[in-house]
Amino acid sequence: VNVFFLISGYFTINFKLNKFLMLLGEVIFYSFFIYIIFAIEGGEILNVKNIMKYSILAVNEYWFMTVYLVLMLVAPYLNIVIDLLKADKRKYSIFIITLFAITCIYGFAFDKDVINVNGGYSLIYAIFLYFTGNFIKTYDIINDCKKMHILYMLAGGVNFLLALFLVYLGKGNMAWKLFSYNNPIVYIQAIALFISFLTIKCNGRIGIFIGRFGQYTLGIYLIHSHSLLIPYRFRELEIIMKDMGVIFWPFLILLYCIILY
């Protein structure tokens, strides 16, 4: 999710009504199609309330799509701010650092309902990532940062060890919080992963492969994140994880994500 918002900022969003409506239509299609299947199978009641919920109001089923569609609407104004800032790297840097302090320091450590960063599941955090992505492109950060894949693995390792330590102390909720989108370590990981992919030359078959599979990513997200499917999505994984040690959880989750995709 973090990387997707970074990509949006890197290339910037040029709002077009037809693209907005096409994206909204895709959300409605997947949501309503899944609902109809459940209704036919008897797992959901077919009535006006549910038809409205899974069609016209379908966007509420997906926090990410809600945030992204709103981000598309406000993007023209964000781009104006970018035009004002990018002429002065110092001011833009201070702006990014300020947003980082608000969303990833205060928002991660203390925020409840004050600024509603909500663990990164929010518009304000998406906007911060949008600016970050643009900052990377504006000042060509790619050429200044080498071997970012190493930073990505180091940050991931540190976060994982911290989580294990908290689980050992019986602080399971705190351990889970470490995987919030606005955890400073996760934020750094996202940037490192994003820049790593930017430095890869995707020519020939690799480029074709990524292009073909990339176009299905949104559809896959809309399917496995649907509220009617979520109870079934993790059921088998939870059963397996109960019988496995905590140290194997990341590998199980990675394998499960690959299978799910």
Regions found by a protein language model. Give the residues of each.
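Alpha-helical transmembrane segments and terminal signal-anchor/GPI-anchor hydrophobic tails
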Residues: 124, 142-219, 225-253
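Transmembrane alpha-helical segments and their boundary/interface "anchor" motifs
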Residues: 1-5, 12-71, 151, 155, ...
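Hydrophobic membrane-embedded alpha-helices
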Residues: 22-53, 75-115, 146-176
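Interfacial loop-to-helix transition and helix-capping segments at the boundaries
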Residues: 1, 52-67, 109-129, 164-192, ...
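Alpha-helical transmembrane spans of integral membrane proteins, capturing the lipid-embedded, hydrophobic core
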Residues: 19, 23-35, 68-69, 96-101, ...
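Transmembrane alpha-helical segments
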Residues: 5-16, 70-74, 78-81, 128-137, ...
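Loop-centered beta-sheet repeat module
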Residues: 95-141
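Membrane-interface helix-boundary motifs at transmembrane edges
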Residues: 13-22, 78-91, 136-150, 199-211
